[in-house]
Swiss-Prot record:
Its EC number is 3.4.24.-. Ca(2+) 1 binds at E196, D280, C383, N386. It comes from Naja kaouthia (Monocled cobra). This is Zinc metalloproteinase-disintegrin-like cobrin. Residues 9-179 form a propeptide. Snake venom zinc metalloproteinase that may cleave complement protein C3 into C3c-like (C3o).
Length: 600
């Protein structure tokens, strides 16, 4: 039932005090000749167009199904009353979640659920609008409104629980903006990346939605669709690889202590989830009310880590988009981003990595982008580079979704977004006489010659890759062998040259050095921050020969204090990295200092 009070209306997003009623009309979409074979009948179309008015002006909204929303091996898991785990692989490719743009509006975008009318948000002429159906029988009426017209649900501030920040001051991040990347680094940052995302809904939230799994699924799908639009600007695709609903009992002790819940969820992911379902990142969506004002918490710079590539988020708002933005925020921490400082801007009042959640934010600040890029270049997480093969995509190909699928030669996005001179955005075929589009071994629409460098060696431990002259793809990245001397003071390990000094700088900033040897003897004890490793929550000290393979100790200038860095949410934070030199001809392996000749 719709309740009207003057110009106020109660919608799913809350009480809206000013809105416009529109009647979207579906119009026939132009066929994209030569791209797709005739499609079988489906409930939802791959592409749609709607006409309606915004501020009294007619607009045409083009929608394309978000092909990358689900991975090809997507599964759903719930639990029977007797505790049995039930996992299915439902057909989800005929879904109703779309991205889009407005005709003749270059800087426009849309994130829409078309399951039952049009619901979502869109950007038009620099303004963000929201649209949702008015629940009036036999009517196509929809409400369009701005976020400023939605009344606050309550006055309690909603914040992220992350308090540790790697920024000791504003100065280091400002300085990084002056640095320039190498061509190889730029190519790496611009490459498409993929996160196979696993979502868990706890039993408290399940009961809050009256045990209605369909309602929960739709809510989660809308959230992932929104996250996809947010991360597209960073060249990331978020593919939902699994949804798990704890329909019987919680599989961990979900509690009001947000940190404790995150730690337990990370352990559950590592020990219980990953052995049965691969994923790059997982989040727990809970109906519990966390203590204080936090509505989410995540580990920082941990993507691909078995335990710490995780976050927990409270389902704190009626607004699906607000919770989705919090999920995107927490994933941002996993991807190396910290909270925005006062000088960070994104063109709107609020950015995704703002500490407080008051209004929706859909863009990352310049600070977040730099911090994220710095993390990627430093850690080079591997799981995000797994690109799905076109033959793995089981649903019909869609021209304009940035995925090159069966029957396509290129895909540069929609005609409004495409910036390629080599690709026809309407047909997803190469232009006449073009051999390639935007791959590493493609230049001006032609294959680069054999021997052309397509991926430079990053450092002593990397090898350059060369084009073959027969393909637009750069060969697989290869490295120097482990144990090869590098940078005059280290040994190569998995393509990196782990040097203690560099690790100290990464932890504590420029000008930091490795502490004196006597500091490392603290690793023979378990008091303070000294240790070699953790086993079942218990600190294990180092043997005397292994002290330089435990906690890393750093100092500023001529300080005599033994400084260490710890994070209660990440046991590996501040530890000496594997492969680090711990003596002449010796390297760290499994927290032991061993001969480099036998280590690998």
């Amino acid at each position: 039932m719709i309740q009207l009070s003057w110009s106020s209306i109660i919608l799913e997003s809350g009480n809206v005090n000013d809105y416009e009623v529109v009647y979207p009309q579906k119009v026939p979409a132009l066929l994209k000749g030569g791209v797709q074979n005739p499609q079988p009948e489906t409930k939802y179309e791959d592409t749609m167009q709607y006409e309606f008015q915004v501020n009294g002006e007619p607009v045409v909204l083009h929608l394309e199904r978000n092909k990358g929303l689900f991975s090809e091996d997507y599964t759903e898991t719930h639990y029977a009353p007797d505790g049995r785990e039930i996992t299915t692989s439902p057909p989800v490719q005929d879904h109703c979640y779309y991205h889009g743009y407005f005709q003749n509006e270059a800087d426009s975008s849309a994130v829409i659920s078309a399951c039952d009318g049009l619901k979502g948000h869109f950007k038009l002429q620099g303004e963000i609008y929201f649209i949702e159906p008015l629940k009036i029988s036999d009517s196509e009426a929809h409400a369009i409104y701005k976020d400023e017209n939605v009344e606050e649900e309550d006055e309690t501030p909603k914040i992220c629980g992350v308090t540790d920040t790697t920024w000791e001051s504003d100065e280091p991040i400002k300085k990084t903006s002056l640095l320039t990347n190498t061509p190889e680094q730029d190519r790496y940052l611009q490459a498409e990346k993929y996160i196979e995302f696993y979502m868990v809904v706890d039993n408290i939230m399940y009961r809050h939605y009256k045990r209605n799994q369909l309602v929960i699924k739709r809510k989660v799908y809308e959230m992932i669709n929104t996250m996809n639009m947010i991360y597209r600007r960073l060249n990331f695709h978020i593919a939902l690889i699994g949804l798990e609903i704890w329909s019987n009992i919680n599989e961990i002790n979900v509690q009001s202590d947000v940190k404790a819940t995150l730690d337990l969820f990370g352990e559950w992911r590592e020990k219980k989830l990953l052995p049965r379902k691969r994923n790059d990142n997982a989040q727990l969506l809970t109906g519990i009310d966390f203590n204080g004002t936090p509505v989410g918490l995540a580990y920082i710079g941990s993507i691909c880590n078995p335990k710490t590539s995780a976050a927990v988020v409270q389902d704190y708002s009626k607004s699906t988009r607000m919770v989705a933005i919090t999920m995107a925020h927490e994933m941002g921490h996993n991807l190396g981003m910290n909270h925005d400082k006062g000088f960070c801007t994104c063109g709107f009042n609020k950015c995704v990595m703002s500490t407080r959640r008051t209004k929706p934010a859909y863009q990352f600040s310049s600070c977040s982008v730099r911090e994220h890029q710095r993390y990627l270049l430093r850690d080079r997480p591997q799981c995000i580079l797994n690109k799905p093969l076109s033959t793995d995509i089981v649903s019909p190909p869609i021209c304009g979704n940035y995925f090159v699928e069966v029957g396509e030669e290129c895909d540069c996005g929609s005609p409004a977004d495409c910036q390629s001179a080599c690709c026809n955005a309407t047909t997803c075929k190469l232009q006449h006489e073009a051999q390639c589009d935007s791959e590493e071994c493609c230049e001006k629409c032609k294959f680069k010659g054999a021997g052309a460098e397509c991926r430079a060696a990053k450092d002593d431990c990397d090898l350059p890759e060369l084009c073959t002259g027969q393909s637009a793809e750069c060969p697989t990245d290869v490295f120097q062998r482990n144990g090869l001397p590098c940078q005059n003071n280290g040994y190569c390990y998995n393509g990196k040259c782990p040097i203690m000094t560099n690790q100290c700088i990464a932890l504590r900033g420029p000008g930091v050095k490795v502490s004196r040897d006597s500091c490392f003897t603290l690793n023979q004890r378990t008091r303070g921050c000294g240790l070699c490793r953790m086993e079942y929550g218990r600190k294990i000290p180092c043997a005397a020969k292994d002290v330089k393979c435990g906690r890393l100790f750093c100092k500023k200038r001529n300080s005599m204090i033994c400084n260490c860095s710890i994070s209660p949410r990440d046991p590996s934070y501040g530890m000496v990295e594997p492969g680090t030199k711990c003596g002449d001809g010796m390297v760290c392996s499994n927290r032991q200092c061993v001969d480099v000749k036998t280590a690998y």
